[in-house]
């Protein structure tokens, strides 16, 4: 099970522009590096499903919810 600290570390690793959030582009780049490419529409849909504050990106709390559900 992932805890808040681990989720924050993952966010920091994925957050290339250091905004404190993961954009669809950052998530797509990560998925591509682990040989798990998704279409942009799929990634955007995933983020939209888990984006509680409606900003189009995933923050630490939202990422934690995804990883622990």
Swiss-Prot record:
Indicate yes or no for the key word Zinc-finger: no
Q: Name one GO molecular function term.
A: calcium ion binding
Q: Which UniProt keywords apply?
A: Calcium, Metal-binding, Repeat
Xref: SUPFAM superfamilies: EF-hand
- Top-rank taxon: Eukaryota
The question of whether Transcription is a record keyword is answered with no
Q: Could you say which residues bind Ca(2+) 1 here?
A: 15, 17, 19, 21, 26
Span of domain EF-hand:
2-37, 38-69
Where on this chain does Ca(2+) 2 bind? 51, 53, 55, 57, 62
Protein name in UniProt:
Calcium-binding protein
